[in-house]
């Protein structure tokens, strides 16, 4: 009902589900990472899971159904999963990015063309992965996917000058 109420007031609504870590220390979701190498593809498939598993896929599809039923304007299929999107398989590919592309297609099938879809990269993730002397723009295939409508970047700029003193 809230989405419909906000829309009735002339506002646009984007659903932005967050993954919070429910373990001691409550680490940032961007620290969840796979292990580079031969097992990375299977590992990312397990993290995303199926539509009825308790993985990222089930969560995103749940919110896609809400977006479709309630008339949301947009849906972020994930956010700040830097550790996952940087994980590389044995061939140097990025299996979590492949999973997000598949997930975008699955969400598109639920919400249709009228709901804008994207993945919100962390400010330290969006510009690529820098390692072993190379820069790889790992998210480009996701953002260029026909099921993704725009580039989204989470950025938390300071609202005030936090330094002490005048000036």
Where are these regions (language model features)?
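Alpha-helical scaffolding within the catalytic cores
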Residues: 59-63, 131-141
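Glycoside hydrolase catalytic-domain groove-lining segments
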Residues: 98, 102-118, 141, 145-167
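A short beta-to-alpha transition loop/helix N-cap that caps and shapes the active-site region
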Residues: 127-129, 159-160
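Short, flexible/disordered intra-domain loops and linkers
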Residues: 29-35, 86-95, 129-135, 165
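Substrate-binding cleft and catalytic face of glycoside hydrolase catalytic domains
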Residues: 1-89, 110-119, 123-124
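Intrinsically disordered, low-complexity regions
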Residues: 3, 41, 128, 133-136, ...
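Extracytoplasmic/secreted proteins, especially bacterial periplasmic and envelope-associated proteins
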Residues: 55-62, 95, 99-102, 106
